[in-house]
């Protein structure tokens, strides 16, 4: 205790009532036409492109895990694969506004988070910056392997191949992986883009990310920290401990000068309704609405909000507002991001705990379909443009997988 604080018995024993504010649930309702003043055609299409890259990456892994082949390429990989097909919009929306100085720590199924943050970084960095990163990373070994794939027409395309090849090689335990294959699927990361590891321990990123946020705070470092977790992690004590640590009163009451203020950390929960085979809401958890938990942590209720993770623009809208709070010293923040995984907990999961009717109902809101349709209807681009992106994405992924 650095300071002695008087605990007033009269204040402690005073009668009264606690009051709580309303917590917003899925309040975003803007149309594409309304968003055209905030996003260019290139912006809209880049969001779709990044979602398509992630979907194809996960589709490729699913095919290899279940059929030992992808587009005629035979390969067997016995390692784990926790896929995020269906969660692309949540990951891309989150990463869209984040910079290199913003760190993301992954959830239990973090391929989409790794790729989304990396693709966002590639878009923001200059060609010279990208080349320097690729040339200097592990002595340029991964870059040299990527350059052998064939000619490219831009540095950014080279960087996209680099991140896909390095991530896939890491998952397949190959030496050209970002960490020589030692991390694998559950511990893949790429620090030059602010992508920190995910964790095989459910909820394990929460205390680690909180430590990173404390590091940024005490050392006056730029950027914020995003702790990603699944809704299943809310049954784990370290997650609550991390949120409490990040929200300690002393940051606002005892720390002085420019050090006064909350921790720069956003606890984002990818709320896909399941923790392995257990249904969280209505079965294994007690919160009913996950965003409610913020009310039990801080008087500000952690600025908690429930958002539609099937709409990347809704996620970007929420991230913009929450980033302002964090940069103004008003953290921590809690986001309950609704999403859904179309594959099982892992590729060996038979999905016995959910019905085909449920899966089909959620697939009607597949972000790859609904976001594309919204852009076509708003005349941002025609179907041919989207078909070209998909074809290019499949061709690139096939080339990388073959090598």
Regions found by a protein language model. Give the residues of each.
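Cofactor-/ligand-binding subdomain signature composed of acidic, glycine-rich
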Residues: 1-78, 100, 124-136, 140-146, ...
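Glycine/aspartate-rich loop-and-adjacent alpha/beta segment that forms the canonical ThDP
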Residues: 1-27, 324-403
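Hydrophobic alpha-helical scaffolding
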Residues: 34-37, 80-84, 154, 158, ...
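Structural signal for hydrophobic packing residues in well-ordered secondary-structure cores
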Residues: 52-59, 98, 102, 168-176, ...
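Cofactor-binding active-site loop characterized by glycine-rich and histidine/acidic residues
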Residues: 63, 72-265, 276-301
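Structured core elements
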Residues: 82, 105, 266-268, 306, ...
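Glycine-rich beta-alpha junction loops
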Residues: 111-112, 271-274, 311, 337-344, ...
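Conserved thiamine diphosphate
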Residues: 220-221, 286-321, 364-392
């Amino acid at each position: 205790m650095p300071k002695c604080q008087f605990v007033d018995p009269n204040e402690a024993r005073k009668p009264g009532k606690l009051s709580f504010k309303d917590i917003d649930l899925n309040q975003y309702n803007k149309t594409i036409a309304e968003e055209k003043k905030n996003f260019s055609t290139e912006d809209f299409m880049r969001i779709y492109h990044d979602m398509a890259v992630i979907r194809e990456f996960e589709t490729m892994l699913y095919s290899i895990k279940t059929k030992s082949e992808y587009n005629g390429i035979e390969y067997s990989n016995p390692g784990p694969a926790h896929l995020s097909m269906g969660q692309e919009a949540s990951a891309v929306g989150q990463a869209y506004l984040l910079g290199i100085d913003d760190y993301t720590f992954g959830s239990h199924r973090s391929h989409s988070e790794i790729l989304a943050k990396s693709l966002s970084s590639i878009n923001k960095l200059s060609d010279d910056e990208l080349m320097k990163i690729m040339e200097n990373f592990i002595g340029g070994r991964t870059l040299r392997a990527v350059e052998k794939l064939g000619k490219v027409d831009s540095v950014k395309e080279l960087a996209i191949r680099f991140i896909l090849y390095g991530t896939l090689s890491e998952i397949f335990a190959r030496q050209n992986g970002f960490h020589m294959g030692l991390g694998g699927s559950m511990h893949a990361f790429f620090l030059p883009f602010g992508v920190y590891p995910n964790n095989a321990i459910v909820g394990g990123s929460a205390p680690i990310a909180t430590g990173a946020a404390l590091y940024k705070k005490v050392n006056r470092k730029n950027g914020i920290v995003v702790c990603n977790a699944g809704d299943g992690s809310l049954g784990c004590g370290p997650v609550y401990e991390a949120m409490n640590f990040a929200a300690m009163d002393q940051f606002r009451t005892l720390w002085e000068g420019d050090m006064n203020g909350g921790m720069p950390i956003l606890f984002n929960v990818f709320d896909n309704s399941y923790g392995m085979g257990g249904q969280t809401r209505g079965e294994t958890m007690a919160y009913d609405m996950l965003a409610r938990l913020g009310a039990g942590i801080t008087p500000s209720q952690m600025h908690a909000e429930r958002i539609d993770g099937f709409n990347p623009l809704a996620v970007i809208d929420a991230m913009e507002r929450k980033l302002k709070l964090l940069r103004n010293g008003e953290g921590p923040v809690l986001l309950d991001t609704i999403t859904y995984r179309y594959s099982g907990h892992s590729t060996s999961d038979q999905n016995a705990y959910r019905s085909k009717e449920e899966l089909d109902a959620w697939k009607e809101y597949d972000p790859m379909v609904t976001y594309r349709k919204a852009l076509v209807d708003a005349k941002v681009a025609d179907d041919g443009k989207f078909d070209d992106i998909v074809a290019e994405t499949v061709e690139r992924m096939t080339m990388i997988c073959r090598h």
